[in-house]
């Protein structure tokens, strides 16, 4: 039968190459390490109390004054107070206009009687009469002479315990503080030429603008603020004040190093990232009350924005990783609302945004180092989606929000329709935000995260602002572009190709002839015949089949087969009700029973859920038992073969994923049958189950105990023509007992006879199975 292709892939899934073996051995290799706990093994506690230690203060404190500056000689700026802070007695400062004014300031410590002291002023040894009667304050004395050979005369004094004095040039005058703290005030004494007046300071000093004279007065009377007295304040040369502050440009290209052929360029750029999510909402077949999948998909987005007056064209690709799978099942009836799987991103998820623009920074982005980025956070809020049911009120999924925070940046490659682009991949970690999401008219509410149903909330895009910097090794000749080696790119985005291929596969269902499909399903398809009809792949069948087998090895079907033996016996023994009416006839009362799988006791809410699990295992048992009857896997393999031959987009890269997905997703609504003399038991993956007589198709109570015994030893058959279809066929056309038995056993010859006779019931059933072969 056609399902032979799946069996071959499973039996040969061990095929691999030596590099895969080496990698697998490396990942599985373990080392036993013995840890000696030492003397703490008895108590588990250390013998001392551990504290947090010193807690550093992270408060940023900045100096409030312009200074201090090192002692020097300078032409004091006009309209600036020169606040001098000496630490010991003696000469403090001196100055002159070189024509008719020479002045000097000395500091006298407390408790000094009237005495003569020698100072070096204007290069000469000078004897000056000084005194300080105060026991707490220091005394600044200002001396002035009018000629080079004249005598210094005392003009003014300032007494203060803080050892601070100050003067200023303004309006061709010298202003000075006089008096005693805390009542010292400013006054002027000299008329000078501002342009030629130099001051030589012997102590550290500060510069205070005239507009802050009140602050200068406060310092003279009360002392400097505490931050200025700390040892962490280091005086600098006055020349540093002349350095102009140049604000670095956010968008600039800096040459780091350069040779004849190559140069290192540092690119600093501000950036605006706009992105949006894409999703896929797939509705199941049937009456229109079921949804099979709601998932995130990669999304490309192109836009323009202005950077430093230049219009930039940018391209982003948004994808997610680490999604959480949720489901909702409103009941077992065909008219009960259900979602088999919908994806939600939460704290354990990541969002990737690949960014590229047409600026020079991305022109030669091949050899890159020192890559860094700073980005703002963004909140992504979910919108509403109404599930349109054929009858009744529509459930609405709404709400949900996450906050994206930058978690790093790496290099990546984007694949557009025409070209591959080396780009930056910005990685964002997630934090859930208000509000939570819920589904109206259901019990599902108060769940946090962003569901895939409407992640953009009808917004055109999400936007993040920030900046990045990188150093790139580029050719010295700016006109030359470094070639991109596709063989060593970081990421190959095949999701777009797979998405287009899935759409094509789903659209090809209407082009499949039902009669030819039955013939193809009865053929023993092997790997060569499966792939031989595909264009441009015949010469690469060997390598392609190896890739297919490697991918098939990790499929859910392959994993389930390996656990078949243990799961079958345990799942079969889980159903404990002795006599229950068929679920297609009446609604079951909820019963609490137990299902033990792999030594894990799980609580099941109703019998239909158990039957669904048993039916999934029945598929595995039928799959491993090859018979002459037609199975669902034969039909799905035949549909796969037909679509592969008709496809124009299939390639060696997409083939493994398509074949693995087909084994998992084709014909999701399957029913399996066990025939016991004149009684048939039929169970579905959707939880439905029937028991009926073979000759009359009349329903009878479902004997669970009998069913438990049969599923262990009796052959399992695919219910290609299910019970409802058989009963409808018998009621409208009438069939013989022989035809009934052959249809119950899915005899391909009998099926083809009904199809060739244009029986609408059988034909519609097969067409419905073909329509369920979707990806």
Curated annotation (Swiss-Prot):
Q: Where is this site: Cleavage?
A: 231-232, 241-242, 247-248
Any other noteworthy remark? In group A rotaviruses, VP4 defines the P serotype.
* GO CC field: host cell endoplasmic reticulum-Golgi intermediate compartment; host cell plasma membrane; host cell rough endoplasmic reticulum; host cytoskeleton; membrane; viral outer capsid
What is the recorded name of this protein?
Answer: Outer capsid protein VP4
Region annotation (Spike foot) ranges: 510-775
In the UniProt record, does the keyword Membrane occur? yes
Region entry Spike body and stalk (antigen domain), spans: 248-479
Q: Does the keyword Membrane apply?
A: yes
In which residues does the motif DGE motif occur?
308-310
């Amino acid at each position: 039968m056609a399902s032979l292709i799946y069996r071959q892939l499973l039996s040969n899934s061990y095929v691999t190459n030596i590099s895969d073996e080496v990698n697998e051995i490396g990942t599985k290799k373990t080392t036993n390490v013995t840890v000696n706990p030492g003397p703490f093994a008895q108590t588990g506690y250390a013998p001392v109390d551990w504290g947090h230690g010193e807690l550093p203060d992270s408060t940023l404190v900045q100096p409030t004054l312009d200074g201090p500056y090192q002692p020097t000689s300078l032409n004091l700026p006009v309209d600036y107070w020169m606040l001098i802070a000496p630490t010991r007695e003696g000469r403090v400062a001196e100055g002159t206009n070189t024509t008719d004014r020479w002045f000097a300031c000395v500091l006298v410590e407390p408790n000094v009687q009237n005495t003569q002291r020698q100072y070096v002023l204007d290069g000469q040894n000078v004897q000056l009469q000084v005194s300080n009667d105060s026991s707490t304050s220091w005394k600044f004395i200002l001396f002035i002479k009018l000629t080079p050979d004249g005598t210094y005369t005392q003009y003014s004094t300032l007494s203060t315990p803080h050892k601070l004095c100050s003067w200023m040039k303004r309006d061709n005058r010298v202003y000075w503080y006089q008096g005693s703290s805390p009542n010292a005030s400013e006054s002027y004494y000299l008329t000078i030429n501002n342009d030629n007046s130099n001051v030589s300071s012997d102590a550290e000093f500060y510069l205070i603008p005239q507009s802050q004279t009140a602050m200068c007065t406060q310092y003279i009377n009360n002392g400097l603020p505490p931050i200025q007295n700390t040892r962490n304040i280091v005086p600098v040369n006055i020349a540093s004040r002349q350095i102009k502050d140049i604000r670095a440009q956010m968008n600039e290209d800096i040459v780091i190093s350069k040779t004849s052929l190559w140069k290192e360029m540092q690119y600093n750029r501000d950036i605006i990232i706009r992105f949006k999510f894409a999703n896929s909402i797939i509705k199941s077949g049937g009456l229109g009350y079921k949804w099979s999948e709601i998932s995130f998909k990669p999304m490309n987005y192109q836009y323009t924005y202005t950077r430093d007056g230049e219009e930039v064209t940018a391209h982003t690709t948004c994808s997610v990783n680490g999604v959480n799978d949720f489901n909702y099942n409103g009941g077992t009836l065909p008219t009960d609302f259900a979602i088999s799987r919908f994806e939600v991103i939460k704290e354990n998820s990541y969002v990737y945004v690949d960014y590229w623009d047409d600026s020079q920074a991305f022109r030669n982005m091949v050899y890159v180092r020192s890559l860094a980025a700073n980005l703002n956070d963004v909140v992504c809020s979910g919108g509403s989606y109404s599930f349109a049911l054929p009858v009744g009120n529509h459930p609405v999924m709404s709400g949900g929000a996450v906050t994206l925070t930058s978690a790093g940046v790496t290099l990546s490659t984007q694949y557009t329709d025409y070209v591959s682009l080396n780009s930056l991949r910005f990685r964002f970690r997630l934090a859930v935000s208000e509000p939570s999401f819920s589904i109206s008219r259901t019990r599902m509410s108060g769940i946090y995260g962003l569901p895939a149903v409407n992640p953009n909330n009808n917004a055109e895009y999400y936007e993040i602002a920030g900046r990045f910097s990188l150093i790139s090794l580029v050719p010295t000749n700016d006109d030359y572009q470094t070639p991109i080696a596709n063989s060593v790119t970081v990421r190959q985005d095949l999701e777009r190709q797979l998405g287009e291929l899935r759409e094509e596969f789903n659209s090809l269902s209407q082009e499949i002839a039902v009669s030819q499909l039955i013939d193809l399903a009865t053929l023993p398809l092997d790997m060569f015949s499966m792939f031989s009809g595909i264009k441009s792949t015949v010469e690469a069948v060997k390598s392609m089949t190896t890739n297919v087998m490697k991918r098939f090895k990790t499929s859910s079907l392959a994993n389930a087969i390996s656990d078949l033996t243990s799961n079958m016996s345990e799942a079969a023994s889980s159903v404990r009700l002795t006599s229950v009416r068929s679920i297609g006839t009446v609604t079951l009362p909820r019963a609490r029973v137990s299902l033990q799988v792999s030594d894990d006791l799980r609580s099941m809410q109703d019998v239909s859920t158990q039957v669904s699990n048993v039916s999934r295992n029945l598929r595995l048992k039928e799959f491993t038992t090859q018979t002459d009857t037609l199975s669902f896997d034969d039909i799905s393999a035949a549909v796969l073969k037909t679509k592969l031959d008709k496809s124009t987009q299939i390639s060696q890269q997409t083939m493994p994923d398509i074949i693995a997905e087909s084994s998992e997703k084709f014909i999701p609504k399957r029913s399996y049958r066990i025939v016991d003399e004149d009684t048939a038991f039929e169970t579905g993956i959707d939880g439905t189950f029937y028991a009926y007589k073979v000759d009359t198709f009349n329903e009878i109570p479902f004997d669970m105990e009998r069913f438990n015994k049969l599923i262990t030893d009796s052959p399992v058959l695919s219910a290609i023509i299910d019970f409802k279809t058989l009963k409808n066929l018998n009621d409208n056309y009438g069939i013989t007992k022989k035809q009934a038995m052959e249809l119950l056993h899915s005899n391909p010859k009998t099926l083809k006879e009904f199809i060739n006779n244009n029986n609408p019931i059988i034909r519609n059933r097969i067409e419905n199975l073909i329509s369920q072969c979707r990806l």
